Regions:
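Amphipathic alpha-helical interface elements
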Residues: 1-142
Length: 142
């Protein structure tokens, strides 16, 4: 038997489409899932970790993040964005009434990663742009 294929492979085109949602909860949850999936693809390629192991519920997001951070692959503003995107997701996933001020602060801290933008962009627009630019930066590691 060969390797079990992941349920889906992340793509920038799909990410751009799926982030065009009106539901804020969905926006933050889906954005983080895409980032986590690309982290898994990096771990699979760079460290030869089987996708079955990465899909196991015992392997937490923080473990994936730490492996990439401590190996030196995840650094600078990409690392910062990955952490902030996960923090935002956690605030929505683990609280009935998330602290909107804390979420706004996290979004404000996100970096555009070389993408041009306007100052009039909404916080949700900034989140979308930053998730896509972070995904693109991570994809270059493959």
């Amino acid at each position: 038997m060969g390797k079990k294929a992941p349920m889906w492979a992340p793509s920038k085109k799909e990410l751009e489409k799926i982030l065009e949602v009106d539901n804020v909860h969905e926006l933050f949850l889906v954005g983080q899932v895409y980032i986590e999936r690309i982290l898994e693809k990096i771990l699979e390629k760079k460290f030869n970790i089987p996708i079955e192991a990465l899909d196991d519920p015992m392997i937490m997001w923080s473990q994936k993040y730490l492996i990439l951070e401590k190996s030196g692959l995840l650094k600078g503003n990409v690392k910062k964005n990955v952490r902030l995107i996960n923090n935002i997701r956690n605030r929505y996933a683990h609280r009935l009434k998330p602290d909107e001020k804390a979420i706004e602060n996290n979004i404000r801290e996100l970096e555009y990663l070389g993408v041009s933008h306007t100052n009039s962009i909404t916080k949700f627009g900034k989140y979308r742009v930053c998730v896509i630019s972070t995904f693109t930066a991570l994809e270059k590691m493959l």
